[in-house]
C-alpha cells in the first residue's frame, strides 16, 4: 500500500513540473497592441512672446524662455527649443516651439 501511495504522489509531482518550468509570456493580440500605440504625433509650431527682464534672469537664455512660456501658457503646449533675444527697455523676446492649436498629425 505504501508503494502505491508513493508512486501516485510521484506521478502527481512529476506532472506538475512542466507547468512550473514553462515561463512563456502570454501572447498579446495584435488588436490590443494597436489599442495602446499612439495614433497621433504632436505637431510643433514656433511661437513668440515678449517678457520683462533680461535673457539670463532665470538661468540660461533657453531656460529663462522655457520657464516664461510655462508660466504664461498651459503646460500642455510643451515648449521646447526656446531662444531668447534681448530687446530694448529691459525686455526679452522669447521664441519656443509649442504644440500647435490643431495639435496632431495623423499617421
From Swiss-Prot:
Belongs to the DEFL family. Its main location: secreted. This is Defensin-like protein 242. It comes from Arabidopsis thaliana (Mouse-ear cress). Pfam families: SCRL (PF06876). PANTHER family: DEFENSIN-LIKE PROTEIN 242-RELATED, DEFENSIN-LIKE PROTEIN 245-RELATED. It comes from the Eukaryota. GO terms for biological process: defense response to fungus; killing of cells of another organism; signal transduction. Residues 1-22 form the signal peptide. It is found in: Secreted.
Amino acid at each position: 500500500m505504501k508503494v502505491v501511495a508513493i508512486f501516485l504522489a510521484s506521478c502527481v509531482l512529476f506532472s506538475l513540473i512542466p507547468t512550473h518550468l514553462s515561463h512563456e509570456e502570454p501572447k498579446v493580440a495584435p488588436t490590443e497592441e494597436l489599442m495602446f500605440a499612439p495614433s497621433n504625433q504632436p505637431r510643433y509650431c514656433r511661437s513668440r512672446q515678449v517678457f520683462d527682464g533680461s535673457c539670463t534672469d532665470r538661468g540660461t537664455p533657453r531656460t529663462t524662455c522655457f520657464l516664461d512660456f510655462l508660466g504664461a501658457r498651459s503646460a500642455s503646449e510643451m515648449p521646447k527649443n526656446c531662444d531668447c533675444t534681448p530687446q530694448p527697455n529691459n525686455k526679452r523676446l522669447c521664441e519656443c516651439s509649442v504644440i500647435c492649436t490643431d495639435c496632431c498629425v495623423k499617421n
